[in-house]
A protein has these predicted regions:
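A membrane-topology feature that recognizes alpha-helical transmembrane segments
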Residues: 1-198
């Protein structure tokens, strides 16, 4: 009985860990909603706020746990497909089809990077959650904006590592870096910028 209670407690603790910090989520979502409402027409502002909420949750959880919950990545992917169907100038079906193709292509590319790194280094560098996040960003972003999104995330990660090194923190080749914590904000920034100019 004790072991059963211990297992239940461990599962409950894990579930709590994979929940976003409500202060971060609510406060951040309010900020995203305000910025979106100020600069975008209301349908795009609603889409931007939805994406921002998912990305805030993902960044917060990944920064603490190095995990991206399926609920977050799947929700971001599905809402991206809904947005594609809503805003595509040709038709809803065409929007969903092109968004699905972008999602699959982006996930396949990052999956290839993951497999290549594992073969080369003998250990995993990217988690499956990162691949699912790549699919979600592919659904949301125009294809020409996807490289910019990854560039922003990479630059932010490198700056963070550099600052940690300057503060005296020991950074090694095997030091884990939560990609989602940097990629999630980059996804929203790229989407917002794309919506703003286009």
């Amino acid at each position: 009985m004790t072991s059963e209670h211990g297992a239940e407690a461990a599962l409950a603790a894990a579930a709590m860990t994979l929940r976003p910090n409500l202060k971060v989520l609510i406060g951040g979502s309010f900020g995203v909603a305000l910025i979106s409402a100020l600069f975008l027409p209301w349908p795009l502002a609603l889409a931007s706020t939805t994406l921002g909420a998912f990305m805030l949750a993902g960044a917060d959880i990944d920064a603490r746990t190095f995990l991206l919950p399926d609920l977050m990545t799947a929700g971001a992917l599905l809402s991206g497909l809904v947005a594609a169907a809503t805003f595509d100038p040709v038709s809803a079906w065409f929007g969903v089809a092109t968004a699905t193709a972008r999602a699959a292509g982006t996930a396949l590319v990052l999956g290839g990077v993951r497999a290549g790194y594992a073969r080369l280094r003998g250990r995993e560098g990217l988690g499956l959650g990162d691949i699912k996040l790549a699919a979600a960003l592919g659904a949301w972003l125009p294809v020409e904006a996807i490289p910019l999104c990854f560039a922003l995330a990479t630059a932010a990660a490198l700056i963070t590592v550099l600052l940690a090194t300057l503060r005296g923190q020991r950074i090694e080749r095997t030091t884990r870096v939560p990609l989602g914590a940097f990629l999630c904000p980059a996804v929203w920034l790229t989407y917002f910028g794309s919506a703003l100019v286009g």
